[in-house]
Design a protein with these regions (language model features):
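Loop-to-helix element that buttresses phosphate recognition and phosphoryl-transfer chemistry
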Residues: 10-64, 149-154
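Hydrophobic, aromatic-enriched interface-forming segments
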Residues: 115-167, 178
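Phosphate-coordination/substrate-recognition cap region in phosphate-metabolizing enzymes
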Residues: 38-127
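Conserved beta-strand termini and adjacent loop/short-helix elements that scaffold enzyme active sites
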Residues: 7, 78-81, 225
Length: 240
């Protein structure tokens, strides 16, 4: 059997002008992953990332750690199948529509007025609103032309996963640097969970964590979820 490792990118820049950029902590998280793998002699046969900067940068940091240690690291491939869903687009296009009809969402948004998005309270309020909007998105209740549907997103991710399964069928270890949504879509494929459960699992995927699957032509099995043995201190654990 082969092994597939899905790595969530290091912490991005939530609340900043450009989210798609690793924070200083995200850079540190990525470095410790690379260091942990090098120390344990982790051999990778193939490495991929999505097209987003935070995904590619996480891969680059791990690659740099390997090369600085004189360890082999394969040339990476970029595959848009592993891009995250467009959370900004979903909120931009669906939130105004839902605010007209969802009183719970209206109340949450009203509470957010004047609160710093990066404060603990601001993050909590954002997450509550985000979950309501995302529930509508995955249910397909409110579709807009500008936003990729949940069904299309899942199909896109699984196309990428199935290509890896076909291209690296036996005795290989493949790493993919991606995001929480793509990891949750792959989890759903492995454990056959309902859509809402799959999306909920995405909320708890830690930055810089590793989720592991073992596969062959007949099986695709989850063998490790959200693993962060490379984080020596709780201060390194983030979810957004």
């Amino acid at each position: 059997m082969s092994t597939l490792l899905l790595i969530r990118h290091g912490q991005a820049s939530f609340g900043a002008g450009d989210y798609d950029k690793l924070s200083e902590l995200g850079i540190t998280q990525s470095f410790f992953l690379g260091e942990y793998w090098v120390e344990r002699g982790m051999k990778l046969d193939a490495v991929f990332s999505g097209e987003q900067v935070r995904q590619k940068h996480t891969l680059e940091i791990v690659s740099d750690v390997y090369r600085a240690a004189g360890s082999d690291f394969p040339e990476s491939g970029i595959n848009g199948a592993f891009n995250e869903y467009d959370a900004t687009g979903i909120m931009t296009h669906l939130l105004p529509k839902l605010l007209k009809e969802n009183s719970e969402l209206q109340e949450i948004v009203n509470k957010s007025s004047g609160i710093d998005t990066n404060s603990p309270e601001g993050r909590k309020i954002f997450q509550l609103a985000f979950e309501i909007v995302m529930d509508h998105w995955i249910a397909g209740k409110t579709e807009v032309e500008e936003v990729e549907t949940w069904a299309h997103f899942k199909a896109r991710v699984l196309d990428g996963i199935k290509k890896i399964v076909a291209d690296f069928p036996s005795g290989k270890t493949v790493a993919v640097f991606t995001s929480g949504g793509a990891i949750s879509a792959t989890l759903q494929y492995a454990i056959q969970s309902p859509d809402k459960v799959a999306l909920g699992l995405g909320w708890v995927v830690k930055n810089g964590s590793v989720t592991e699957f073992r596969y062959n032509a007949d099986r695709f099995t989850l063998t490790g979820f959200n693993m962060t043995p490379h984080f020596y201190d709780d201060v390194l654990v983030t979810y957004r």
